[in-house]
From Swiss-Prot:
The gene is dapA. Its main location: cytoplasm. Its EC number is 4.3.3.7. GO terms for biological process: diaminopimelate biosynthetic process; lysine biosynthetic process via diaminopimelate. It catalyses: L-aspartate 4-semialdehyde + pyruvate = (2S,4S)-4-hydroxy-2,3,4,5-tetrahydrodipicolinate + H2O + H(+). The lineage of its organism: Bacteria, Pseudomonadati, Pseudomonadota, Alphaproteobacteria, Acetobacterales. Pathway: Amino-acid biosynthesis; L-lysine biosynthesis via DAP pathway; (S)-tetrahydrodipicolinate from L-aspartate: step 3/4. It comes from Gluconacetobacter diazotrophicus (strain ATCC 49037 / DSM 5601 / CCUG 37298 / CIP 103539 / LMG 7603 / PAl5). The active site is at 137 (proton donor/acceptor), 165 (schiff-base intermediate with substrate). It is found in: Cytoplasm. One of its GO terms (cellular component) is cytosol. InterPro entries: Aldolase_TIM, DapA, DapA-like, Schiff_base-form_aldolases_AS, Schiff_base-form_aldolases_CS. Homotetramer; dimer of dimers. This is 4-hydroxy-tetrahydrodipicolinate synthase. Catalyzes the condensation of (S)-aspartate-beta-semialdehyde [(S)-ASA] and pyruvate to 4-hydroxy-tetrahydrodipicolinate (HTPA).
Length: 297
């Protein structure tokens, strides 16, 4: 699949669970199909929002395979393949390739705090393992390490490293990356719903979104408006969803978005420990944001 397909509103999928914490595959299938029909430009299973840290390896693999089956080629599936073990990330990427995913999203290794050279070698090794396009996921708030612009430019020399999901919340970064990587197209996707229009203005091409779990049609329309040059329309949608973006991070992701999904009848709110149920004041904030945006009566 052409890497130019990795643009627009791409949903970082929640993983629906039953009350006992087991996976709700039937609910997940309906949810993924709804994402496609509502206009999402792509989906990312088993990322941060999909609770990858608390999934078993077998569950991770099943979710990726099932997502590919449900999507059935209608939009790109970018499989989460991140780990703080390079060998484990390679295994996830190879599995994603074997079941028909269109690309992989690989997070910067967390907890073990590699140097920039270690980061470079990690991503190059994963990129060498398959012929899938690889999107770097830079989220220093969770991984502690920040992939520098210089390191990213080195990585971009690899033909299969095609872009980045930037969750630094630093709006200088897309400008810096665009200047540093000029030898080929390099897709920059925002990892921050709240600043998405500003990110697009700085050269971004899309967003791997949490909010699109519950408002996929609006998120997709924002990106279509931007791509069509209807800046005022894109800003109007951003303004409408602004309080929702904020509320969905009032506690650790994906707790708030799963609660929002439960209010809308899309999925249950259950997360696996150590993520706890939302506090009552957080629940109120999410409800008020959804109501204010016209998503909940």
């Amino acid at each position: 699949m052409e890497t130019t397909m990795f643009k627009g509103s791409i949903t970082a999928l929640i993983t629906p669970m039953n009350d006992d914490g087991s996976l709700d595959f039937s609910g997940f299938g309906r949810f993924v199909d709804w994402q496609v029909t509502e206009g999402s430009s792509g989906v990312v299973p088993v990322g941060t929002t999909g609770e990858s840290p608390t999934l078993t390896h077998e569950e991770h693999a099943r979710i990726v395979e099932y997502t590919v089956q449900v999507v059935a080629g209608r939009i790109p599936v970018i499989a989460g393949a991140g780990s703080n073990s390079t060998a484990e990330a390679v295994g996830m990427a190879r599995h994603a390739k074997s079941v028909g995913a269109d690309g992989v999203l690989v997070v910067a290794p967390y907890y073990n705090k590699p140097t920039q050279e270690g980061l470079y070698r990690h991503f190059m090794t994963v990129a060498d393992a398959t012929d899938l396009p690889l999107i770097i996921y830079n989220i220093p708030g969770r991984s502690v390490v920040d992939i520098s612009v210089e390191t990213m430019a080195r990585m971009a020399q690899h033909a299969r490293i095609v872009g980045v999901k930037d969750a630094t919340a630093n709006l200088l970064r897309p400008l810096q990356v665009r200047r540093a990587i000029r030898h080929k197209p390099f897709t920059q996707l925002s990892g921050e719903d709240g600043t998405v229009v500003s990110f697009l203005a700085a050269g971004g091409e899309g967003c791997i979104s949490v909010t699109s779990n519950i408002a996929p049609r609006l998120c997709a329309e924002l990106h279509r408006a931007w791509q069509d040059g209807r800046v005022a329309d894109a800003m109007a949608i951003q303004d409408r969803l602004s309080a929702v973006h904020d509320a969905l991070f009032c506690e650790s992701n994906p707790g708030p978005v799963k609660y929002a999904a439960s209010l809308l009848g899309l999925a249950g709110e259950t997360c696996r420990l150590p993520l706890a149920p939302l506090a009552e004041d957080s629940r109120m904030r999410v409800r008020e944001a959804l109501t204010g945006a016209g998503l909940l009566n």
